[in-house]
Amino acid sequence: ISSAASDVYKRQLAPMNENEYISRLKARDIRPTALRLLILRTMAGFDRAFSLADLEEELDTVDKSTLFRTLTLFLAHHLVHGIDDGTGSLKYALCSSDCDCEIDDLHTHFYCTHCRRTFCLRGVAVPQVGLPDGFSAETINFVIKGICADCSGRN
């Protein structure tokens, strides 16, 4: 069932066929094994940012350490980015194909306090922050917390 919040998230990621999954891995210098392709396909199927536990639930035949190692590899090669949404569990989301996870590529994330889903809002830029002399940002985590479109329709 499609929902308003899920639709916003899905519009940001174009559907891919098998060759596109392979190309996406190769473009990030990741060897496309059957397991990595399975994990990437599963990630692309989520309508929100996902946790390691979410992947475990979807891929119950793959052990947790393999999933964790694959996520770590995908993070290192900028295939996914990590999101600290304040829940204590790191979430992940697929990067767009032109993302290098540099400061200019950053976008806002939204955490719904009602349904506890986290969404990438790729069209919403992270606000510019002026830093004092001598300070330089390496990463920025900008999370808005509130009620998503799905949950606000239920209230």
Where are these regions (language model features)?
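Single conserved hydrophobic/aromatic residue that forms the stacking wall/gate
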Residues: 1-12
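Short alpha-helical segments that sit at the start of domains
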Residues: 15-37
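Short capping segments at the starts of secondary-structure elements
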Residues: 32-34, 46-51
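Short amphipathic alpha-helical elements of helix-turn-helix/winged-helix folds
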Residues: 24, 41-46
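Basic amphipathic alpha-helical segments that dock to polyanions
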Residues: 67-77
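Non-DNA-binding regulatory cores of transcription-related proteins
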Residues: 76-155
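A short acidic, leucine-rich amphipathic alpha-helix
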Residues: 54-58
